[in-house]
Amino acid sequence: MAEKLKIIPLGGLNEIGKNMTAYEYGGEIIVVDCGMAFPGDDMYGIDCVIPDVSYLIKNKSRIRGLFITHGHEDHIGAIPYVLKQINMPIYCTRFTAGLIKLKLEEHQLVKSTKLVTVEAGKSVRAGKFTVEFIHVNHSIADSVAFAIHTKMGTVVHTGDFKIDSTPIDGEVIDLARLGELGKEGVLCLCADSTNVERPGFTPSEKTVGATFMRQFQNCDERIIVTTFASNVHRVQQVLDAAAKCGRKVAVTGRSMENMMKVSTELGYMKVPKNTLVDINKIKGLPKNKQVIVTTGSQGEEMSALYRMAFSTHKQVEIGAGDKVILSASAVPGNEVTVGRVINELFRKGATVIYDRADMLHVSGHACQEELKIIHALTKPRFFVPLHGEQRMLQIHCQLAQQMGMDRNHIAIGDNGSVIEITGKSMKIGGSVTAGEVYVDGSGVGDVGAVVMRDRKRLAEDGMVVVVLPIATQDGALLAPPEIITRGFIYVKESGDLMKELQNVAMDAADGITGRKRSRDDGELRSAVKSAVSSYLFKNTKRSPMVIPVVTRL
């Protein structure tokens, strides 16, 4: 029987976020990345979404390690939740380890977790796998791709990347090593598809610094900059521009404060001397000497920028003349919330500069020409497009064919697909359990499809509670039912409807004989629920959640 290497995406396909891929060879497994996704607008009460790791739980004795490409939430956000079910060592670069450690501390997992830091250019032996760390450029420091070596051959897993010839930290992507791997022979390439729809090259991060200088030099008022907290190089450029323009910088927002602490302690950010001040002290400076760096680039409701916009931030109040710079583009799905914050900032008299107006943000993902370079350098026998929605995966497949690949050597899978590679062929050989697990407060996985459906229904049509006072002995209805509504109608203006609902509920209850009413609450509740629901839809064309409550007296 021919040897097989299995590639099993558990997240990140046909979606943006919750990236996770398992590699299986010789009866052993390694996992690459462990990310979360933001909940959709219809996921009421959900904090985040993580991959379903049922397959990994069933096979946890075969797992040899979790390897992390970089420290973005869509690659590390699920780690604490998964570690509570699967104890496995984590291998990552130093900066990524610093961010993961914050999560482990928050979940009291530091002592029970083996966290190993690995430098780019080094390799780790994990059972029958040898995983080589290769430096790449991305919108967060210390990002890597992996060359996953097995006796069958080498898989190059790019993670998120771009080709930046002028990176802020001076560390360019290791194209030389990728080229060497191509010469040695790459069995399969698994590559980022996020920006495959965009032609050309992604601009260098350094271009944003020039924009900051121009915006700072042409402003005599306070400047507030919001960006992704994880983009250390972006924040570094804000600090540098502020220092050159004689301004002080204060930081607000929990994730931004944590990121500043980790990046400065580990040496990934260098704060110009006498530039950083406490957020409580900066308001004592002249407006033209102030810069505030904040979270909230995605319009998150509890973020610092959101609270500034809606006048609930304790230290910062937006006023006329303030210049607010949004140095980030909205993640797909967040456009409405970002727009709401921008509108409120304008309403308060601020000047808002955002991506459409200037070169204030550049992507951290490779565009078409960069992807072609990676394909040309690695010369893979097989190809699996990762990290993207269906159209992105399909376009990446077309790009690979333009580079000369045989369509039969390309696999476009779904989350849970088992992509099997032998030395000569590739196929999707079945699937494993995969999907979404909802995190709601401290609950993980206890909110399923039925609960989400009920929450959606409550949010859209409200709730009607019908309280039925029933005599315990003979089942007689002791009084007219009490009707309680929430989120359905304004009761004071709907007296006729409320009276009619009482009659409908009484008629339904009367349809159940007294003897049955005295013994069977279930049948009574079912009859009342059906009658009230039908009446409401017929007369209002709405379907609130109807909850009959039987009270025995």
Model-derived features with residue positions:
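His/Asp/Glu-rich metal-coordinating catalytic cores
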Residues: 2-67, 72-284, 303-317, 336-340
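A glycine- and charged-residue-rich anion-binding loop/surface
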Residues: 13, 37-45, 62-63, 354-357, ...
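Solvent-exposed loop and beta-edge segments used for protein-protein assembly and interaction
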Residues: 15, 140, 286, 458-460, ...
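Short glycine-rich phosphate-binding loop at a beta-alpha junction
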Residues: 89, 384, 547-548
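Conserved hydrophobic residues forming the short capping helix/wall of the S-adenosyl-L-methionine
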Residues: 104, 400, 536
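Short Gly/Ser/Thr- and Asp/Glu-enriched loop/turn motifs at secondary-structure junctions
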Residues: 119, 414, 542-546
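Hard-cation-handling environments
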Residues: 197-327, 331-356, 360-500, 504-516, ...
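C-terminal tails and terminal domains of large nucleic-acid-associated
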Residues: 517-553
